[in-house]
Amino acid sequence: MPLFRFDTALLLFIHVPKTGGSSIEAALRRMGGRPALLAATTQGYARCTPQHMQAEVLSTFVPEDFYDMRFAVVRDPQSRLVSEFKMRRAGRKQRGLAALSFSDWVAQTFKRYERNPYVFDNHIRPQSALIPERTEVFRLEDGLEAAVGTVARRLGRAMPELPLIRQGTTDPVLVPAKTARNIAAFYRDDYARFGYPAPEGG
């Protein structure tokens, strides 16, 4: 989870995958933040990149009293998983692999998670496991401006331009009722903690 050093504060951004985190990191840089705990690879020593550490691991690296501010952005769990599917589907297409339906991909991915919770660089792990308690949480559905604007005000900085990075496609994905129920069960803690309604069929 990246740290950003400003001249007056040290900020910890809990980067939940597929919630606009790359755009927020770019905005924090534009405000003058210097990043740390941010890498494109695991550097050969870890099971996921540092920006995607779950809360339990994060606490061993960065104690709570080390920084001045902590926030995260969350997303409806089903919407987040659909976004992940679209990204993986595009990757399969580039590699010339056969396309999977969303239902088949979810079933395969949840089985892979059982064997390795770090699958896809910790992208599948529930948001509730990534975000420590007492973290200030914003919803992607309310716009990234809400999160970045709040941080900017507290730092006494101007609101930066918010770039759209890695924006996904808008094509619809069919989510059968059985798959929706499986998603709701897998992410039950996310639905409960962050107040999202369970998906239809869930």
PLM segments and residue spans:
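Membrane-interface amphipathic segments in extracytoplasmic regions
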Residues: 1-202
